């Protein structure tokens, strides 16, 4: 009997000691949970279930997981599970340190870049047309800027170029390579500055020094200036850019010869003018007399003419000129 009582006392003491230990463990775990820590020693360990905040009104209950009794679940816990893409607040009811949260976000970012990339790769016709149209407009702007810089277009020329680019449907997608003007047309004694102007210069045949001819807007003007100076220095043996404009042409007549020719022509014209004036005066005198007589006769009215009946009432002595002459001669002879 005594031994049985002693055994019962020892069992009670052990039970009370175990209960005290359990209470201490519960207090310790509660303190850890309230301070932000959690206990997770493995799949077969004890877990706390409840709210993550220490101010939860519900009492925390300690439950024993039943995973240790299922060997299949234990083996599944042994295999590594891939991390989920959801956030920690949704996946776990426990507080995770910031380092683990940042690591999960870094491994599985939740940004819309992937969605944008999927939208760009998708075969939606609207999404394919928009980038193509934008690229075509950009190419047109590049071409317009290129030709405007080369041709130095005015505002009207710029509008014409824009209309031409709009009308053309088969525009090249790449900008044509820039070719210098010197590669297309070369002139002797002409070179181009890097800002677009053209200069001309020539070497003198005697001392081989360079003679500056000037700066020009076009290569043709500079080539003409070189040809003029080369023709002056070397004559017909000069190598010119435009030989058809200078060679095989009539030599210009001297100035004094032109003056002599003009003097002789002026003298001849003056002499001819004098002769014409004298003949005109002679003819003019006769013509004036006849014209005056005709005008006098024309001024007499028709009824006063010689055949008019008005003269019948007047009796004029009719005399002959011969009789008058004879009478005068007879009278003169009598007196003698």
Curated annotation (Swiss-Prot):
Residues 1-10 have a biased composition (Basic residues). GO terms for biological process: ethylene-activated signaling pathway; positive regulation of cellular response to heat; positive regulation of DNA-templated transcription; regulation of response to water deprivation; response to salt stress. Residues 1-60, 247-280 are annotated as: Disordered. InterPro entries: AP2/ERF_dom, AP2/ERF_dom_sf, DNA-bd_dom_sf, ERF/AP2-like. It is found in: Nucleus. Ubiquitinated by RGLG2. Ubiquitination of ERF053 leads to its degradation by the proteasome. Keywords: Activator, DNA-binding, Ethylene signaling pathway, Nucleus, Stress response, Transcription, Transcription regulation, Ubl conjugation. Residues 186-243 bind DNA. Induction: Induced by drought stress. Induced by salt stress. Induced by abscisic acid (ABA) and heat stress. One of its GO terms (cellular component) is cytoplasm. GO terms for molecular function: DNA-binding transcription factor activity; sequence-specific DNA binding; transcription cis-regulatory region binding. CDD domains: AP2. Belongs to the AP2/ERF transcription factor family. ERF subfamily. Interacts with RGLG1 and RGLG2. Transcriptional activator involved in abiotic stress tolerance. Can directly regulate stress-related gene expression by binding to the DNA sequence 5'-[AG]CCGAC-3' (DRE element) of their promoter region. Involved in the regulation of stomatal closure movement under drought stress. Acts as a positive regulator of drought stress response. This is Ethylene-responsive transcription factor ERF053. It comes from Arabidopsis thaliana. The lineage of its organism: Eukaryota, Viridiplantae, Streptophyta, Embryophyta, Tracheophyta.
């Amino acid at each position: 009997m005594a031994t049985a009582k002693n055994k019962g006392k020892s069992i009670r003491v052990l039970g009370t000691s175990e209960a005290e230990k359990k209470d201490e463990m519960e207090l310790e775990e509660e303190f850890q949970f309230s301070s932000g820590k959690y206990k997770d020693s493995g799949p077969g360990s004890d877990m706390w279930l409840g709210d993550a905040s220490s101010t939860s009104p519900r009492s925390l209950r300690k439950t024993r997981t039943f995973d240790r009794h299922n060997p299949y679940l234990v083996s599944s816990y042994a295999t590594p599970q891939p991390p989920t893409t959801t956030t920690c607040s949704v996946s776990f009811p426990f507080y995770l340190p910031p380092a683990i949260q940042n690591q999960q976000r870094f491994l599985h970012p939740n940004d819309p870049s992937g969605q944008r990339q999927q939208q760009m790769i998708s075969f939606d016709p609207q999404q394919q047309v928009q980038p193509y149209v934008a690229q075509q407009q950009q190419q047109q702007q590049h071409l317009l800027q290129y030709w405007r810089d080369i041709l130095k277009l005015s505002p009207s020329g710029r509008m014409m170029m824009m209309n031409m680019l709009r009308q053309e449907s088969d525009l090249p997608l790449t900008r044509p390579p820039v070719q210098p003007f010197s590669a297309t047309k070369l002139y002797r004694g002409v070179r181009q500055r890097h800002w677009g102007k053209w200069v001309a210069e020539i070497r003198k045949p005697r001392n081989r020094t360079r003679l500056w001819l000037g700066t020009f807007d076009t290569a043709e003007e500079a080539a003409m200036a070189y040809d003029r100076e080369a023709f002056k220095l070397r004559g017909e043996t000069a190598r010119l850019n435009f030989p058809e404009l200078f060679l095989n042409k009539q030599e210009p007549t001297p100035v004094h010869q032109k003056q002599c020719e003009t003097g002789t022509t002026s003298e001849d014209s003056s002499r001819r003018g004098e002769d014409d004036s004298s003949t005109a005066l002679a003819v003019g005198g006769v013509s004036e007399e006849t014209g005056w007589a005709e005008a006098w006769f024309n001024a007499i009215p028709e009824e006063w003419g010689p055949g008019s009946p008005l003269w019948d009432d007047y009796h004029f002595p009719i005399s002959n000129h011969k009789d008058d002459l004879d009478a005068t001669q007879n009278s003169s002879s009598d007196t003698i």
